[in-house]
Amino acid sequence: MREYCSENGLSEGWDGLNQVCEDDGGTELLPWSIIDNVTDAEVKSWPILTYEDTLLGAEFNTSVSVDQGLFQIGYQTIFDWENQRTKRHNYGYALVGFWGLIVLFGTMHNFIRYLMNSSILRSKTMARCQSFIERYFAVPPILTMRKKNRIFSMPSTPRLQAIIISIYFIISIVLMCVDYHAFSENLYFTKKSTQLWRYIGDRAGALVINNLPVMWLFATRNNLLLWVTGWDFATFNTFHRWIGRACAIEIFLHGMAVCIYQYKELGTEYFLPLWKDVDWYMGVVAACSIILMTLFASAPIRKSVYDLFLIVHQSFAVACLVGLWYHLPVDGPDYVNFIWPCIAVWSFDRLVRIVRLLTWNKFASYSSAEYNRDGNVIQLRTRVRRIASPCPGSYYYVYGWRSLKFWESHPFTLSGWNTVKTADESYTELIFLISVQSGFTSSLRGQLLNHESPETDSSSAARKACLSVEGPYGSNFCPWRSETALFVIGGAGITVATSFMQDLVDLVQSGMHIDQRIKRVKIVWAVKNPAFYQFVYERYMAAWEAVFASTDIELSLDVYLTMLSKMDSDDEMSLPEHRNEPNESTKNMDTVISPSSSSNSHITTEKVPSGEAPTNAGTGILKTTFVQGRPTINDVVRSQIETLRSSEEKQLALVGCGPATMAHDIRLSFVESSNDAQVAVDFHLAPFGW
């Protein structure tokens, strides 16, 4: 060291070697002072150790000096190892930085949008930039062909999300494939191949560890980034799933690379005993947990057995963290620190959930549930504290405390609310409309049918329920700033429309609707079961008639009965009839023709013979039209655009909620309508499923 190192280099190198001894052996090097009395003449008399001697395993009983060649090889070995350690740290931080930049972009966009909506900032340039982003990136789906999407059932993923995910994977692949330096005379490895396998395995593991806190953060519903960026939970959940898939690939590569390295470098004799080491087999537990967690999180499994998915997913998440806790210390304490953010994020999310539950719900709160057999729909009503006004379009997580799975919670969109304030009590009644599927809703239906009262109407079953809600969640949107609000709804997504209409009802009753620009509201609803429509009309829409009678706001409803499109053309089917009879002033009302549908349109208030045009079946306030078949969404939106071209405001609020295929078409319709320079379209697509 005296011969090849400078004074500063000697001190740094000695400190580095001493640190290695402390970390790996738990001891310190002997002090440098023990060789202070060694002279240069004595050093020259020592044998010279060469690289060839190390290969032959030569033994010396005296002190030796290192030749120039071996020193250079040793220097290159240590330098290359430290260089690879630094690179895998930096590359892992680069992935975290990538998501930081994405969140920063979303935050800036959300802030600018807030300034523009609040009239603080009015800039044509900023408006054009925002319109450009929404038209070409934020809203359009990956595929722009409707028929292709229906044939291959491709998801309606927004283009910007797809671009972000693609860039993330490209960066991950590049960081995994570049900047390796292997040489044959490495003192740590016997072969170049084992050297590469070790470097690849270590880098893959480092990328996984750096990804974990981000993946955990994006999975929580009480994520502060939701508020900062204005993105919905579905966006972060999409990112969470793709980060998880990247982690599964990287952890598989890490495990295979390290196993190949250990087997080739050590041989079977030393490789097999490794499986008895705690850090080794717990690493296998963590790797298998991540891979299985990703496989069981596939869409078919989530939809078919969601309850099982939830238990398995959380169990594997815990097993992953426990496995990493025992596996990572072998590489030092640096990587163990990445476990704590995951625990902190999870704990914060659960704490906020508990706070929300205690804040909103009363200990002796009243809840009820009613099941309608014909519509196969459940209406939940639960009373909560009057803390804040309910937000239209928001959703809550519902807990069923009498269930054996009381820890589960399921999200449902708020369909309406009632505010009660008397001398004795004050509360808000939240109303949810739930289409019965498998899992929680099916179990709830079974409970209602099992406890059915003889006095209850044969078409429904109702009872008190022990329920609590946690929320609200979801992004804010106000369609009443536009002259026309168009709701394009599919199936149970009607709760989005009824929720916004409840907000408008409150504005009308308080007289605050005059501060809004809204003049026309049109709801286009595609529904399979006519009985579902009848139930919604009786419980929600019938009340709109009296409220809007004193206003100049036009209400219209187009109901597309998709079940009829599957029937034979010779079949006839009774359509729902409103219980309230039209008054004298509406008997001679002109027929309201809806935009074209994807099948032949024919309708009447009683029977549906083939080949007839749609006929109005509503009263004077809510003009209702029934149409057989599915709506052609592009034609629906285009007809509203044509109407607005001759108006003063020329602004349309387009709100959509429906299955993946409908959401895909709604996005495409917005893109096409946004090309019209005369009419401004404000777009909002509410989540249909989770």
Named regions from a protein language model:
Residues 1-58:
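Soluble extramembrane regions of membrane proteins in the secretory/endomembrane system
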Residues 40-72, 110-151, 429, 608:
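Extended, low-complexity, polar regulatory segments
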Residues 51-77, 318, 437-441, 446-452, ...:
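Reductase modules of NAD(P)H-dependent flavoproteins
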Residues 83-101, 133-353:
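Membrane-embedded alpha-helical bundles of multi-pass integral membrane proteins
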Residues 103-124, 217-225, 298-304, 347-365, ...:
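Transmembrane-helix exit/juxtamembrane "anchor" motif
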Residues 122-149, 366-385, 566, 570-596, ...:
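Non-transmembrane, juxtamembrane loop and terminal tail segments
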Residues 298-302, 307, 311, 315-327, ...:
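Membrane-proximal cytosolic interface modules of multi-pass membrane proteins
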Residues 367-462, 527-528:
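Ferredoxin-reductase
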